[in-house]
Design a protein with these regions (language model features):
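Bacterial N-terminal signal peptides
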Residues: 39-52
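Gly/Ser/Thr/Pro-enriched helix-cap/hinge segments flanking short amphipathic alpha-helices
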Residues: 56-58, 68, 78, 387, ...
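Blade-edge beta-strand/turn elements of extracellular beta-propeller
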Residues: 61-64, 135-144, 185-195, 265-277, ...
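Repeat-based blade/solenoid architectures
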Residues: 70-92, 142-155, 194-205, 251-252, ...
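Beta-propeller blade termini
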Residues: 90-100, 129, 150-165, 179, ...
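Hydrophobic beta-strand segments that make up the repeating blades of beta-propeller
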Residues: 103-110, 162-171, 217-221, 298-303, ...
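Short, conserved, GDST-rich strand-edge loop motifs in beta-rich repeat architectures
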Residues: 109-123, 223-251, 412-429
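Asp-box/WD-like beta-propeller blade repeats and closely related beta-sheet repeat scaffolds
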Residues: 139-156, 169-209, 219-249, 253-255, ...
Length: 585
């Protein structure tokens, strides 16, 4: 039985039970600062290693895939030799509780091959029902998930407000919208809803952009890429002296889509009339969050080899594109990057969401700190992410408190685009290891992945976090290219106290867009409920907090998408709680 919190009353559950004008530094100034901090980086990292939190000592990530039941999923996308760009984009993954039994399930998005796609494609996803102990059963066909094509990404949310969790799949050729019928069954309603477009979509995110009480949808679209006119390898498509597949540069991009929900199951694309993505950039990861604390959901789009997009929601139906003005469009040197995955968190607990996105090799991933005045400062090198990510091609990324010490850490998965990378010099590899950045406070991170048992190399794409075994720490699932996924159990991450907060709207739906604050020891942590994040993926919708040695949270508050608020005081830790939105009367 789920915990319930309403109007300040709470029933507790025990561990293991179910869930009850912007002023910012110029590019030259930021680059100068980066050069200064690089000279101090070696000494700083040594100091951080010495001061590494005792909370994370003994933390290990254990690969439990062979015993999980997930090994039957094949992440093959196209040919092994990767002749075309569509064959390397990979797929997303989601932790979700589709049957509301309190145990996390896993959804993996599947691609196809060009030959198979011409015959109708493969099943776009596979759904695995979890038993709470680490075993997952393939229920794809039983659940009615029969749409075929070339799957790419996933976003989760209750678009029809019936209290059951639905999901949206992006893909090449067509997208799919699955409505949850209950009793473990789904129906595909994309065409009926008006969102089964025939082109190449990658990222997606549900959010109530107009705050009318139902979930709208943003979709990032990539390339116009007809299979009967695929660009072939030639001398014009060259990377470090090797002929490689062509794209995306030189190929026509597609406008992103902004679908507004009419509340009756129909969506209308208003992107053109709202001047969304007029330049038709190469859209990949999408992250919806309230970056300026005005209670309206804003949009960040990580674009491939073109400027990123940052849409501020003005609350009147208009979105203002401010990427250049906010400092989120380019690298700290003013250069376009190959940006892919994205996440946001309040890394310094100042009440403002900071931004992180992954990039291609020789670019380093980007850590942008929110100044609270409508601008961001690039602290990639100053925070410990520059040198550590320089030779990696980053994809999935997720913030989370991996050791329950009350600071949000960061997990990044990698893998090069080109099989030819193994022939490059300068340390590049096709398969690459994963990175774990532990947050040591003062905006400082230390990469410790190998120390935590992550030395294997993969061609990884999608990444999601969630506590699948209900032991109070965050576990990891990764969708790999050309192979089975990886399920990592977090061992030792639950030494500190924890809390999982499940937020539910009046209709019983997961409260996508809700903001959750938890205060203990005079410090406040911030989380937001998001339908998607990372690279084409979705984390558990329940919000996880770590509290270190604390015994209770002084206060837990929720700001609902409707604008209402709920506040709980003196909350016992090491449990799952459900907070229900108060009625509107």
């Amino acid at each position: 039985m789920a915990d319930s919190v309403q109007a300040g009353r709470m029933r507790e559950s025990k561990p293991g039970e179910g869930p009850v004008a912007l002023s910012h530094p110029t590019f030259m100034q930021r680059n100068g600062r980066a050069r200064q901090v690089r000279s101090l980086l070696t000494g700083l990292l040594g100091l951080l290693a010495t001061l590494a939190s005792a909370q994370s000592q003994g933390l290990r990530f254990v690969d439990v895939t062979p015993a999980s039941g997930l090994e039957g999923f094949d992440g093959l996308q196209g040919s092994v030799s990767k002749q075309h760009i569509i064959e390397v984009m990979g797929g997303g993954v989601a932790f979700l509780d589709f049957d509301a039994d309190g145990r996390l399930d896993i959804l993996l998005v599947r691609g196809s091959t060009i030959e198979q796609f011409e015959r109708g494609g493969d099943l776009m996803c596979a759904l695995y029902r979890g038993d709470g102990s680490g075993s997952f059963e393939d229920v794809t066909l039983r659940a009615g998930l029969t749409a075929r094509g070339w799957g790419q990404g996933v976003a989760v949310g209750d678009f029809d407000s019936d209290g059951r969790l639905d999901f949206f799949l992006t893909g090449y050729g067509s997208n799919a919208l699955y409505r949850n019928l209950g009793q473990g069954r789904f129906e595909e309603v994309g065409r009926l809803a008006g969102i089964a477009r025939s082109h190449w979509s990658l990222g997606a995110s549900f959010a109530d952009f107009d705050r009318d009480g139902d979930l709208d949808l943003y979709v990032s679209n990539y390339l116009a890429y007809p299979l009967d006119r695929l660009p072939q390898r030639d001398a014009n498509c060259n990377y470090r002296g090797f002929d490689v597949f062509c794209g995306p540069r030189g190929l026509p991009g597609l406008r992103d889509s902004l679908y507004l929900n009419d509340g009756a199951g129909k969506f209308t694309d208003v992107a053109a009339e709202r001047s969304i993505d007029d330049d038709r950039l190469y859209g990949l990861g999408v992250l919806v969050a309230d970056y300026n604390n005005d209670s309206w959901p804003d949009i960040f789009v990580a674009n491939d080899l073109t400027a990123n997009l940052f849409y501020q929601n003005n609350g009147d139906g208009r979105f203002e594109e401010l990427a250049v003005l906010t400092g989120t469009a380019f690298s700290q040197d003013g250069v376009e990057e190959g940006s892919m995955g994205v996440d946001a968190a309040d890394i310094d607990r100042d009440g403002w969401l900071d931004l992180y996105y992954t990039n291609s090799s020789y670019e380093s991933n980007s850590m942008l700190v929110n100044n609270g005045d409508g601008s961001f400062t690039n602290l990639t090198y100053a925070s410990g992410h520059g040198e550590s990510t320089h030779l990696f091609v980053g994809w999935g990324v997720a913030f989370g408190d991996l050791d329950n010490d009350s600071r949000e850490d960061l997990f990044v998965v990698n893998g090069h685009l080109y099989p030819e990378a193994d022939r490059f010099e300068m340390g590049l590899r096709y398969e690459q290891r994963w990175l774990v950045f532990m947050n040591h406070g003062d905006r400082q991170f230390l990469e410790r992945g190998e120390e935590f048992g992550l030395s294997e190399r993969y061609k990884s794409r999608g990444l999601a976090l969630g506590d699948y075994d209900s032991d109070g720490d965050l576990d990891v699932v990764v969708n790999n290219l050309d192979g089975p996924p990886t399920l990592l159990r977090n061992d030792g991450g639950n030494r500190g106290a924890w809390l999982l907060v499940d937020t539910r709207t009046e209709s019983g739906s997961p409260a996508v867009g809700a903001r959750v604050l938890a205060t203990s020891g005079g410090s406040t942590q911030l989380r937001e409920v998001r339908s998607s994040a990372s690279y084409l993926s979705a984390n558990d919708l329940r919000q996880h907090f770590g509290f270190g040695p604390d015994a209770r949270a002084e206060q837990v508050s929720v700001r609902w998408p409707s604008g209402r608020t709920s506040t709980l005081s003196d909350v016992e830790l090491n449990q799952v709680i459900t907070v229900e939105e108060p009625d509107g009367e």
